[in-house]
């Protein structure tokens, strides 16, 4: 039995892991992929103490910091659900993905408390599972995924040197995507369904200096076209008239959806599916904490996620001390 299981692999999980190691807890971090949304970020210039870095570098520094404390990180684990047992402990069931070491390490069924087997048993749990990209849900999107449609500019942008591409969205992620693509592609269209951007002014100002970027406002993307690969996209203007752009890449950045489906059904969530937490980062179930973008805390920022991870861990320590 672990004192604590931390589920996730980005800023919140990293901060929680560092503090857990310093408190000498018996714990483990389990995650599908380490790095999370941080690893898919482009330039990062608002992480205190580092004037400028990028997501890949910062994610590696997170990993290095955890490694320096000897923290056990198990990757390739896809958590199915968390259940609180009658004795107050938590049963986590999961499936092993590629690279996971958990395959074949099932614990016996807890006959008096649960009919299901537990892959991990812990006194407390921190959920720091983050978010995943929201989809457009339009014709052509699924058909051309990984064939020109991408949700990660950092990952796939370098595959389009000298090409004509489009970024769809109206927030920071879309602006950052366009800025990155402007240095790679021949032409970048930025498709914003709104009359203005919701992102940071400094990003928009930088984007407006790029000669190969064209911003199209009040444009709702209706379908993505192509043959074997993407060849274009169609959008409707505010009058409903359709226009087609010839592009070879479409980068979708229209927001995120919280990865909150693994928590017990009795856990309170808001209308967006975000886990509701109190000032101690605890859910409405004692011993179950949540941190980072998966929660209802506003302003989704790396530094805020790290702070929440710290808060969740220290709160979990207080909970564990009371259990003794």
Which functions belong to the PLM regions below?
Residues 1-7, 35, 39, 73-163, ...:
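FAD-binding core/adjacent interface of flavoenzyme oxidoreductases
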């Amino acid at each position: 039995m672990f004192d604590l299981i931390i589920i996730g692999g980005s800023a919140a999980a990293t901060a929680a892991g560092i503090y857990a190691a310093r408190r000498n807890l018996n714990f483990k971090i389990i995650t599908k992929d380490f790095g999370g949304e941080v690893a898919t970020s482009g330039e990062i210039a608002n992480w205190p103490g580092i004037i400028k870095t990028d997501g890949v570098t910062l994610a590696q520094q997170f990993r290095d910091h955890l490694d320096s404390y000897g923290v056990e990180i198990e990757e390739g684990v896809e958590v199915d659900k968390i259940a609180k047992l009658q004795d107050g402990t938590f049963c986590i069931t999961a499936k092993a993905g590629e690279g996971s070491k958990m395959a074949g390490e099932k614990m016996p069924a807890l006959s008096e408390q649960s009919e299901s087997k537990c892959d991990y048993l812990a006194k407390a749990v921190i959920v720091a599972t983050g978010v995943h990209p929201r989809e457009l849900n339009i014709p052509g999107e699924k058909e051309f995924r990984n064939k020109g449609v991408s949700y990660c500019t950092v990952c796939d942008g370098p595959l389009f040197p000298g090409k004509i591409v489009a970024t769809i969205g109206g927030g920071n992620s879309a602006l950052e995507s366009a800025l990155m693509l402007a240095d790679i592609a021949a032409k970048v269209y930025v498709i914003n369904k709104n009359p203005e951007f919701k992102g940071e002014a400094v990003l928009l100002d930088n984007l407006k200096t790029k000669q190969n970027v064209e911003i199209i406002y009040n444009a709702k993307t209706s379908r993505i076209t192509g043959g074997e690969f993407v060849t274009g996209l169609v959008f409707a203007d505010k009058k409903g008239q359709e226009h087609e752009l010839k592009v070879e890449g479409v980068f979708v950045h229209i927001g995120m959806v919280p990865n909150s489906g693994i928590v017990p059904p009795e856990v309170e969530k808001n209308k967006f599916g975000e886990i509701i937490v109190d000032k101690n980062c605890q859910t409405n179930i004692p011993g179950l904490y949540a941190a980072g973008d998966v929660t209802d805390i506003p302003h989704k920022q790396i530094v805020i996620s790290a702070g929440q991870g710290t808060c969740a861990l220290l709160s979990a320590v207080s909970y564990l001390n009371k259990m003794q």
